[in-house]
Each structure stands twice: as structure tokens, then as C-alpha cells.
Amino acid sequence: TERRTYLYITVSHKTAYDMASKYGFNQEQREYLDELLSDENNSLWSSVLYGTSGEDNQIVAVALSQVGNVGGRPYWSWYGFNSRVEWCACFVSWCANECGYIETGIIPKYASCVNGVQWFKDRGQWLDGSAEPLPGMIIFYDWDKQGQSGQQDGRADHTGIVWKVENGYVYTIEGNLSDKCTTSRRQIGEYQILGYGVPEY
């Protein structure tokens, strides 16, 4: 006689809002999710499915899920630091790692903004700060803070992830902005924007 064993698996559909509940999104994060899933962003989600160099919403979604974190411990400790450091680059690297982009060489693991810029420039994946970016690009800033980080010197001081571009403004998600994960908005071409790393998603 022949004996057969059958394994039955039930696969159930989970919506984005199901997952938002599972991961404990707060009200602000849910509002960002609503905006990401609005009809006006359909073309952006198509690019995630079919691929567009430099544009990606997976890393944007991961970054948005972290909005509200204070102190950056998950990011700088993941990087390997035993105590707090300036953690904006650790945050970008952590988000990239969550998407598998460090392992695949799409985005570097970097704790120094200067090193992040150089990685993209070495590969010809760099846009000047006057350019109009796409979601998922990596933004770098050269702050003009006399008496603090000093005047602009052409070297990156801060980094984040481009969320969207709308009505002449670039919206970003950044870590270590006043020691928090938060969103920011600046005019395209604003003089403190050094440029953009363009990952080959």
C-alpha cells in the first residue's frame, strides 16, 4: 500500500493597513501611509514593481515607519557603535539594510556622510543639488551653520532619504534631525542641498 501525506496551507491577503496595525503605526505614520497609497502615487508604486533606476518607495516606506524615534539607538547600535554617535547616516544605512540593499550593493553601509557621497560619486551615481530628485534617492546636505558646524565647505554634514517631490519642494525623511527621525521639506535647489546619491534600484 502507498501512504500519502498532504499539507494544506492557507494564504490570506494582508492589506497595508493590516500591516500598519501589526507594526503599531501611530496616527502620524498612518497619515503618511494614506498619502503613499493615494491615487496620485500610483505611478510611483508601478516603478517599485517594474523598476526605475534611482526611484524606489520600499526604502521610503521603511523610513516613514521610523518617524518619531528619538535618540537613534536602533540605528547606531545596529551599525556597531556602543554609544550614541551622530546617527543620520546610520539611519539611512539601517533603512537600506531592511530592504536588502546593502547586501546587494545598491546602497552602501556608511556612518560618515562624506564616505556616502564618495561611494555614489565613484560609481557615477551622483546628482548635483540643483537637480530634481526622485523618491528613494539619498539626499546629502552641506550645512551653513557659522559657529556650530561652520560655514559651508563642500563636504556633506547630513543625509536622509527623499520621500517625494511636490510643487517645487523636496520632502525627506531624516534621522538625527534634532535627535529624532522626522520629515523635512526644502525647496528644490536650496543652497544647503549638496546633492543626491542615485541608487540603481
Whereabouts are the PLM-identified features?
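N-terminal capping segments
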Residues: 24, 31-104
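Generic alpha-helical secondary structure signal
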Residues: 31, 54-61, 114-118, 131, ...
